[in-house]
């Protein structure tokens, strides 16, 4: 509930008039609920994968009954991250100087909050070129877990463990998928995360080429898709009632009022991808005596209104507050330039009542 009130305060200064420092405190509180320690400043706006757009559009539909299932991957979750590889190219030893590329892959799993339950971590390796364009060659893709490292890097075979080996021939699918859920779970402790080593090399050269002929190794882009569940932000989606459609007739009684939050107005448009804004609404109005059924008053509010009618100076009227809220899904860049899709409860005021 405080999330809606926070935005209302920042946008309707005439009503709330928070000091600048108070506004920063409220912003930090909201950002922390998103797992962010500060306002993200993306170094570059990475393209949003098509799968992420599909999940976002599906999650935004009001017909979805369980917002805590990511049907695209068949697992439970309300947070989806596309993590960027933070590793680098490794200088190959002389014995592999021809037709072989080694790369260190690293994904920072410590960005997950402690409360999050990891459901899936899937490595997606995509080739930037069509393998058919590189000639009739067979490539091997070997993925290793790095067990330990030194200042010189991974220096011995005992320092790594083979996770998967795969061959790719012309016409093969342009991507390789590897389930790393169990390994990624251990990576949540930074001291256990040494990353992985990817080795890509030519297995068979065309008979027309001699042993030391150079064959172009395709560039490869690695991403780790991480799906997790925050149980504190996961409730069954409630269908909006007719009261969601705000009445247009003027009235001073307690009811939802229109409030559209545009993220550009608060300077967040550079890191929030979608939506660009949303209808949050707020509650405002009087709770007059006698309270009608339409004002959704509690027994306590009814009695308080009765006492107020006899002693208006000593007893205030009940307050007009949100009693029913609904969630939204947000797509944004986090502090590590990862693309994140997250489901948030209590973001839209649907109904108000006297309390």
Swiss-Prot record:
| Signal peptide limits | 1-15
Q: Where is the protein situated, by its record's location annotation? A: Secreted
**Record SUPFAM superfamilies:** Cystine-knot cytokines
Which positions are listed as propeptide? 16-240
Q: What is its main location?
A: secreted
BP GO terms, sorted? axis specification; BMP signaling pathway; convergent extension involved in gastrulation; heart looping; left/right pattern formation; neuron development; nodal signaling pathway; positive regulation of cell division
Which keywords fit this entry according to its UniProt record? Cleavage on pair of basic residues, Disulfide bond, Glycoprotein, Growth factor, Mitogen, Secreted, Signal
Q: Which InterPro entries match?
A: Cystine-knot_cytokine, TGF-b_C, TGF-b_propeptide, TGF-beta-rel, TGFb_CS
Gene Ontology molecular function terms on file: cytokine activity; growth factor activity
UniProt-listed SMART domains: TGFB
One GO cellular component this record assigns the protein to is: protein-containing complex
So which tissues is this one expressed in?
Abundant in ovaries and eggs, and equally distributed among all blastomeres.
Going by the UniProt annotation, this protein carries glycans at: 108, 179, 296
Cysteine pairs forming cystine bridges in this chain are 254-320, 283-352, 287-354
The similarity annotation says:
Belongs to the TGF-beta family.
Q: How does it assemble?
A: Homodimer.
The protein's role, per its UniProt record: Serves to facilitate the differentiation of either mesoderm or endoderm either as a cofactor in an instructive signal or by providing permissive environment.
> Would you tell me the protein name for this molecule?
Protein DVR-1
The primary gene name is: dvr1
């Amino acid at each position: 509930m405080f999330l809606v009130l926070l935005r209302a305060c920042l946008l309707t200064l005439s009503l709330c008039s928070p000091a600048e420092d108070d506004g920063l405190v409220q912003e930090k509180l909201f950002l922390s609920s998103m797992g962010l320690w500060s306002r993200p400043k993306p170094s570059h706006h990475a393209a949003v994968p098509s799968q992420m757009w599909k999940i976002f559009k599906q999650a935004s539909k009001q017909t979805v009954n369980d917002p805590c299932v990511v049907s695209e991957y068949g697992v439970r979750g309300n947070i989806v991250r596309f993590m960027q590889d933070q590793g680098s190219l490794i200088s190959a030893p002389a014995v592999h100087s021809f037709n072989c590329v080694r790369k260190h892959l690293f994904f920072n799993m410590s960005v997950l909050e402690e409360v999050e339950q990891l459901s899936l971590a899937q490595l997606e390796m995509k080739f930037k070129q069509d393998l058919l364009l590189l000639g009739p060659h067979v490539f091997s893709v070997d993925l290793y877990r790095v067990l330990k490292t030194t200042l010189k890097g991974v220096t011995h075979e005992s320092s790594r463990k083979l996770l998967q080996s795969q061959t790719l021939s012309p016409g093969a699918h342009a991507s390789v998928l590897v389930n790393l859920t169990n390994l990624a779970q251990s990576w949540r402790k930074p001291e256990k995360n040494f990353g992985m080593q990817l080795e890509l090399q030519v297995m068979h050269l065309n008979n027309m080429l001699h042993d030391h002929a150079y064959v172009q190794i395709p560039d490869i882009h690695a991403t780790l898709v991480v799906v997790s569940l925050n149980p504190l932000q996961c409730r069954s989606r409630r269908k909006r009632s007719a009261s969601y459609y705000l009445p247009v007739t003027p009235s001073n009684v307690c009811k939802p009022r229109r409030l559209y939050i545009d993220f550009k107005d608060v300077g967040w448009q550079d890191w929030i991808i979608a939506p660009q804004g949303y209808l949050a609404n707020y509650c405002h109005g009087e709770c007059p005596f006698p309270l009608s059924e339409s004002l959704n008053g509690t027994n306590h509010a009814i009695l308080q209104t009765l006492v107020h009618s006899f002693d208006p100076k000593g007893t205030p009227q009940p307050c007009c507050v949100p009693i029913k809220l609904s969630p939204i899904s947000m797509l944004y860049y986090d502090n590590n330039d990862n693309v994140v899709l997250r489901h948030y409860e209590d973001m839209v005021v649907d109904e108000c009542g006297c309390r």
